[in-house]
């Protein structure tokens, strides 16, 4: 399951992300954070952490460096 989710994120990074404006307020980017979280915590907890990160990545957030 981990590899499947990571593959989906990499497909997003390769095909969808280049068509969108750069808007991530954090480093690493939200998609890179998601991959790192899934690798570190597994599919369930890593995905939940990634979703929480994506919800925090908005115009009202200061952003900054945030590693999983």
From Swiss-Prot:
Kindly give the membrane topology term recorded for this protein: Peripheral membrane protein
Q: Name one GO cellular component term.
A: plasma membrane
Q: Does the keyword Lyase apply?
A: no
Cystine crosslinks: none
Q: Extract the signal peptide range.
A: none
Q: Which UniProt keywords apply?
A: Cell inner membrane, Cell membrane, Membrane
Location(s) in or outside the cell: Cell inner membrane
Q: Which residues form a coiled coil?
A: none
Q: Which Pfam families does this one have? A: YidD
What's this protein's family per the entry? Answer: Belongs to the UPF0161 family.
- What job does this protein perform? Could be involved in insertion of integral membrane proteins into the membrane.
Question: Which HAMAP family does the entry link to?
Answer: UPF0161_YidD (MF_00386)
Under what name is this protein listed? Putative membrane protein insertion efficiency factor
Q: Which organism is it from?
A: Persephonella marina (strain DSM 14350 / EX-H1)
């Amino acid at each position: 399951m981990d590899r499947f989710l990571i593959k989906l994120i990499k497909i997003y990074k390769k095909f969808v992300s280049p068509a969108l404006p750069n808007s991530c307020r954090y480093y690493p980017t939200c998609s890179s954070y998601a991959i790192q979280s899934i690798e570190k915590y597994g599919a369930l907890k890593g995905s939940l952490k990634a979703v929480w990160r994506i919800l925090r990545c908005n115009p009202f957030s200061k952003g900054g460096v945030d590693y999983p």
